[in-house]
């Protein structure tokens, strides 16, 4: 049994529920049988990957849905071996080079070279080029991005790149200038409510409009998250009620408890406990940027106006350090330690002011 988010994923540009004008423009783009390199960007859950797969379906037909998982070993110049997993069809290859860490440059060069020099197996839908889909391009190192820029020029005749990322701010200008940028905005609350109602109707369920609206708001306009929460509500309780509780993910609850622990006590022992909790989140593959953002959001609830500005500025500083460094736990712990010192001083100054 597949999840609703996969079961009802649109397969063609005509089936998309929102941003239909953009879908029509994308269809016109690929109808000629060719297109430039694309840079598709937008927030999580906006539908970037769905639109990319619809473009490939429009270009190559149903054969693009016959996917296989491949494991490849790439040897770096220093003789280090890197294991990388890819998803491929006869027409395209999907890879996340940032999985290779600091060796992402070698992965990009080898992958693009292999794809560009290989021939397609099915001649019925033969095109002059194959497509390489690179995800999380904004997480690539600068060396990898410069290598990508050189490689995309070299193999333009036999290979088209579709780059996918959340933000273009971390993509170097030479890559941005060589791609057609396609921004996929987050769906509106009304769009999400419409999709939730449509999916529930196909499942034979009656979804109250009030609950659909609450799900859309709680998901922060992330359609994937809204569908997953709706399915969780279905498992938890049916028939639906307008005021039923919407279950939260375990890591969100755990992060809130961690923030409460930071606020309740500021000692070296508590800092050690919080470090362990942060490690727990990282080992469960919660991205450090999400942890930082979630911690900041929860901690700001316990700060007054003056302190909020200082804490937000401090979080921005350590988030920047997080991007530059390779050990996330150092920067997360440094942020927590700095907040503890700032918050403790703020509370002590407040108590002194109350003593006449």
UniProtKB/Swiss-Prot annotation:
> GO molecular-function annotation terms?
ATP hydrolysis activity; DNA binding
Any one Gene Ontology BP term: DNA repair
So which residues are the signal peptide here? Answer: none
TM annotation in the entry: none
Q: Which residues carry this modification: Phosphoserine?
A: 125
Residue list for modification N6-acetyllysine: 20
Summarize subunit and interaction data from the UniProt record for this chain: Subunit of the RFC complex, an heteropentameric complex consisting of a large subunit RFC1 and four small subunits RFC2, RFC3, RFC4 and RFC5; the RFC complex interacts with PCNA. Forms an heterotetrameric complex with RFC2, RFC4 and RFC5; this complex has ATPase activity but is not stimulated by PCNA. The heterotetramer of subunits RFC2, RFC3, RFC4 and RFC5 interacts with RAD17. Interacts with CNTD1; this interaction facilitates crossover formation.
Query: What does the record give as the function of this protein?
Result: Subunit of the replication factor C (RFC) complex which acts during elongation of primed DNA templates by DNA polymerases delta and epsilon, and is necessary for ATP-dependent loading of proliferating cell nuclear antigen (PCNA) onto primed DNA.
Give the UniProt family note. Belongs to the activator 1 small subunits family.
**Protein name listed in UniProt:** Replication factor C subunit 3
Q: What organism is recorded for this protein?
A: Bos taurus (Bovine)
Name the gene that codes for it.
RFC3
């Amino acid at each position: 049994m597949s999840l609703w988010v996969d079961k009802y994923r649109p397969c063609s540009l005509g089936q998309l529920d929102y941003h239909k004008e953009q879908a029509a423009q994308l269809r016109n783009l690929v109808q000629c049988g060719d297109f430039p390199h694309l840079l598709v960007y937008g927030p999580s859950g906006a539908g970037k990957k769905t639109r990319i797969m619809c473009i490939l379906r429009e270009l190559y037909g149903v054969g693009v849905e016959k996917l296989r998982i491949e494991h490849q070993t790439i040897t770096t110049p220093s003789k280090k071996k890197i294991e990388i997993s890819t998803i491929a069809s006869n027409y395209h290859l999907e890879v996340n080079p940032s999985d290779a860490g600091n060796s992402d440059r070698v992965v990009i060069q080898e992958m693009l070279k292999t794809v560009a020099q290989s021939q397609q197996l099915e001649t019925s839908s033969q095109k002059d080029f194959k497509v390489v889909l690179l995800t999380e391009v904004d997480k690539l190192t600068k060396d990898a991005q410069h290598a990508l820029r050189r490689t995309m020029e070299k193999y333009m005749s036999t290979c088209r790149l579709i780059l996918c990322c959340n933000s273009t701010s971390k993509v170097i200008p030479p890559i941005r200038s060589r791609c057609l940028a396609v921004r996929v905005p987050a769906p509106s609350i009304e769009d999400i409510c419409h999709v939730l109602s449509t999916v529930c109707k196909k499942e034979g369920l009656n979804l109250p409009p009030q609950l659909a609206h609450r799900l859309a708001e709680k998901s922060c306009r992330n359609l994937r998250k809204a569908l997953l929460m709706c399915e969780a509500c279905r498992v938890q309780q049916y028939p639906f009620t307008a005021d039923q509780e919407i279950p939260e993910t375990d890591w969100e609850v755990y992060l809130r408890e961690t923030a409460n622990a930071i606020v309740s006590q500021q000692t070296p022992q508590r800092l050690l406990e919080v470090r362990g909790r942060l490690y727990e989140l990282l080992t469960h593959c919660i991205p450090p940027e999400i942890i930082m953002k979630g911690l900041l959001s929860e901690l700001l609830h316990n700060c007054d106006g003056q302190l909020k500005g200082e804490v937000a500025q401090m979080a921005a500083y350590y988030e920047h350090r997080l991007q530059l460094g390779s050990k996330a736990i150092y920067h997360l712990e440094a942020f927590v330690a700095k907040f503890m010192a700032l918050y403790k001083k703020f509370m002590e100054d407040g108590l002194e002011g109350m003593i006449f």
